[in-house]
Amino acid sequence: MSSKYPRSVRGCLPLWALTLEAALILLFFFFTHYDASLEDQKGLVATYQVGQDLTVMAALGLGFLTSNLRRHSWSSVAFNLFMLALGVQWAILLDGFLSQFPPGKVVIKLLSIRLATMSAMSSLISVGAVLGKVNLVQLVVMVLVELTAFGTMRMVINNIFKTDYHVNIMHIHVFAAYFGLTVAWCLPKPPPEGTEDKEQIANSPSLSAMLGALFLWIFWPSFNSALLTNPIERKNAVFNTYYALAVSTVTAISVSSLAHPQGKINMTYMHNAVLAGGVAVGTSCHLISSPWLAMVLGLVAGLISIGGAKCLPDWLPDPLQHWGTQLGHGDSSHVWFPDRFAPKSQNMESTSCG
């Protein structure tokens, strides 16, 4: 469906975005250069492969998870890709400027792109709370402000607590969830004309959203291990993330079916609950030395995710109740925070388990 903004506004919004892109090109021209060091070819290929996994998670996983709004069922994927492309550029510059004193030219490495992609995912998580309620320029401002705040927060945490990149980036779930809630809460009320139609859920949202969840599920071990440099820690992170995801998936599907009077699986809850284990072990995945610990975390995460989805929506005020199902998609900290729990909807799809 076409935009309901006036023609004059529709013409200005893309021009603002193009102007910003031109400014970014100038910043890259004056303040960046490629790393000239010779890297080991084997290590270079491995680094690039991890970067590919992260891009698939961001572009396809989070993109399809936003496709359950009727007017944004497919355009949400384009908005997601737009924010990702813009966010990666800004995050590379921001991380470079914040990490060196005095500021100089930013050296771009594959690690820089990998870290920037993970940082940009914070805005893709938060946008679930406002998709359908903001225009293109507002999305651009949201990306720039959020990534600046997230990068500054990581720098402060690193300087005070002396943590590494892995621990810093794992705060993305908490930060993005509450940033998205804050933006949604600050948007003007009542919404502009036509917003109610934009907010309506599509009749069959589960297929594309579940496809996004599958992309995230498959590549989540890469996300949790992307910034670890010690081979043993990376191996532990991959193993523990996989076991936690597997157990949380079995738990979520079983409990969802058990809680339904007719034994059906609520697919809307599944989009996020199957990923609960990956979020739960994110910060400590490289420290867990035995698979049973990760499996217990996955079990608890699945129980909390489904239990919260079933019980908490009635207690949440607007706009948290309506937008809780959108906020953070599959990558948010739905294990711990009530803003992740989905509201009841007549359009929720269920699948019989027996």
UniProtKB/Swiss-Prot annotation:
Where located? Membrane
This entry carries the following GO cellular component terms, namely: plasma membrane
Q: Which SUPFAM superfamilies match?
A: Ammonium transporter
Q: Which InterPro entries match?
A: Ammonium/urea_transptr (IPR029020), NH4_transpt_AmtB-like_dom (IPR024041), RhesusRHD (IPR002229)
Q: Which GO terms describe its molecular function?
A: ammonium channel activity
- Position of the signal peptide: none
Q: What is this entry's stated membrane topology?
A: Multi-pass membrane protein
Q: Which family does it belong to?
A: Belongs to the ammonium transporter (TC 2.A.49) family. Rh subfamily.
Any idea what this protein is called?
A: RH-like protein
Q: Which organism is it from?
A: Hylobates pileatus
